[in-house]
């Protein structure tokens, strides 16, 4: 049974790119509580040396699963100006929340793509990060909330930990704003327990070719193109699994897979994740069937790769 309370609690934690400390601490506490029930107890690497990233090494891995902890959001500039972090949708009057040294903040977003502002009655400290106000909704078919990208990727990776024997599970930072932690994470992995494969546990988009309730998405390409030989292997395994899945072919978008491909290491990679509607808004929406397919697919693939 999925740990929904953990997911709901995690969804309430702010972690705009560059400020992942709180969610990292929350995830690490959960790992330490849950690891006694896992088949294999992993070696845990975390702390200041890893800039809030977390690495779990199970057994003798040949594959690593990556899930980013950060979210999109906004940063306060001068006066009442805001600057996007990552690619949030600009929605006039949407509620934003955060905190500076003077206290809690709840305000509305004003403006459009040409310039965005907040309406908080006092000045907000420069550099303060603001997030969409959270409103979690779940029924028998869907979960809807801000930041399902990539809380559901983290959720899947931690569910996967219960049955892992040989794998790295890595929680990265900065992904929504261009990356930055992956180079040192990959270097550490290849020096400590080298891998040949990387799976990216993240959330993709509902499009004209990808739909709710039709299964987890295996991405053939986004802006970047993984190696066909590895993709064919993943797709063949997925077909044998009997787990519902969809194939994605897009010209845009990216993930931590980009940094795997651009690294100096010969590591194959593939993005596998549930699709969502209302991307980068407070109302991201994912099918529970697709989330279940995502968790099952990762569990299956990690036994076969």
What do the predicted segments below correspond to?
Residues 1-305:
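N-terminal hydrophobic/helix-forming segments and targeting peptides
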């Amino acid at each position: 049974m999925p740990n929904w309370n953990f997911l709901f609690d995690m969804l309430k934690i702010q972690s705009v790119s560059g400020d992942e400390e709180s969610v990292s601490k929350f995830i690490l506490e959960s790992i330490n509580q849950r690891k006694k029930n896992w088949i294999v107890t992993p070696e845990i690497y975390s702390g200041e040396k890893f800039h809030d990233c977390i690495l779990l090494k199970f057994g003798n891995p040949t594959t690593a699963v990556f899930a980013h902890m950060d979210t999109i959001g906004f940063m306060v500039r001068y006066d009442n100006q805001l600057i996007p972090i990552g690619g949030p949708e600009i929605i006039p009057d949407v509620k934003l929340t955060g905190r500076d040294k003077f206290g809690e903040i709840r305000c509305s977003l004003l403006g459009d793509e040409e310039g965005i502002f907040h309406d908080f009655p006092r000045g907000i400290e420069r550099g303060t990060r603001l997030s969409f106000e959270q409103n979690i909704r779940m029924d028998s078919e869907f979960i809807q909330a801000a930041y399902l990208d990539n809380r559901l990727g983290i959720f899947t990776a931690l569910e996967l930990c219960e049955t892992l024997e040989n794998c790295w599970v890595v929680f990265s930072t900065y992904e929504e704003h261009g990356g930055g932690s992956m180079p040192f994470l990959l270097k550490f992995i290849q020096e400590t327990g080298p891998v040949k494969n990387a799976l990216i546990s993240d959330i993709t988009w509902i499009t004209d070719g990808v739909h709710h309730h039709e299964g987890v998405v295996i991405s053939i390409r986004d802006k970047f193109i993984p190696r066909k030989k590895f993709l064919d292997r993943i797709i063949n395994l997925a077909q044998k699994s009997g787990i519902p899945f969809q194939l994605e072919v897009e010209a845009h978008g990216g993930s931590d897979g980009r940094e795997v491909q651009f690294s100096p290491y010969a590591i194959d990679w593939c993005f596998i994740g549930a699709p969502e509607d209302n991307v980068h808004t407070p109302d991201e929406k994912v099918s529970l069937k697709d989330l279940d397919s995502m968790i099952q697919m990762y569990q299956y693939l990690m036994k076969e790769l």
